[in-house]
């Protein structure tokens, strides 16, 4: 009976994030000859699980912030996640062996332009910050001896200062255009962000096929 259960779940599941990174991943998968069903890249497609050119591998498409959770809890064996999400959740069950050098941007502190006219960031002591990354935000400011209250938002971060919820945000920055258009200035880069291959540690130890997939990504 146990053997049958294992057979039922013998497919390797790779979790990928929704959004703009999918176009970069499409090129990447083509290079390593691991091709998901084309519908994976169709934004209008409501399917969540997809077959691939390898019958032993299926893909699932989830929110970028959920990839790590699916992998950490074993629902997916492998995933593609941003280093921002990996660091925010810091799951012990996740191993991230390879930088993919796609989805590049950086995590930064930004503040209202009007605030920076009145005070310098060095003078900050007790602040409120809107962010999708409460753990990383607290860690960052704790290193500087700054007390921080975080407001957890999942998007439209730039609206929080405009509507007086706070005067500072921590968010991903690519070109800086969105910050500028909303009266914000980038104050400090926290770290550079890139996508990484992540693996469930238990699956890595028990499934030899996962090592073969990792080697494909290394090539």
Set out the residue ranges of the language-model regions.
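Domain-level signature for soluble enzymes in the chorismate/prephenate branch of the shikimate pathway
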Residues: 6-219
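Short, Lys/Arg-enriched N-terminal segments with co-localized hydrophobic residues
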Residues: 1-5
């Amino acid at each position: 009976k146990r053997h049958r259960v294992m057979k039922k779940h013998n497919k390797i599941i790779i979790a990928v994030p929704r959004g703009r990174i999918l176009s970069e991943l499409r090129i990447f998968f083509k290079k390593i000859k691991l091709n998901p069903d084309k519908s994976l890249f169709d934004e209008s497609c409501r399917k969540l699980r997809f077959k691939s050119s390898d019958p032993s591998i299926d893909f699932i498409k989830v929110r970028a912030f959920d990839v790590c959770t699916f992998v950490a809890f074993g629902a997916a064996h492998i995933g593609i996640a941003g280093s921002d999400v990996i660091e925010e959740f810091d799951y012990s069950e996740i191993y991230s062996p390879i930088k993919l050098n796609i989805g590049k941007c950086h995590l930064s502190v930004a503040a209202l332009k009007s605030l920076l006219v009145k005070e310098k960031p060095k003078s900050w002591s007790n602040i409120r910050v809107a962010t999708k990354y409460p753990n990383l935000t607290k860690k960052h400011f704790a290193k500087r001896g700054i007390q921080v209250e975080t407001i957890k938002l999942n998007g439209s971060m730039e609206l929080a200062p405009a509507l007086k919820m706070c005067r500072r945000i921590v968010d991903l920055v690519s070109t800086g255009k969105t910050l500028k258009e909303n009266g914000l200035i980038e104050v400090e880069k926290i770290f550079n962000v890139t996508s990484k291959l992540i693996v469930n540690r238990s699956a890595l130890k028990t499934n030899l096929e996962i090592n073969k997939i990792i080697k494909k990504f290394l090539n």
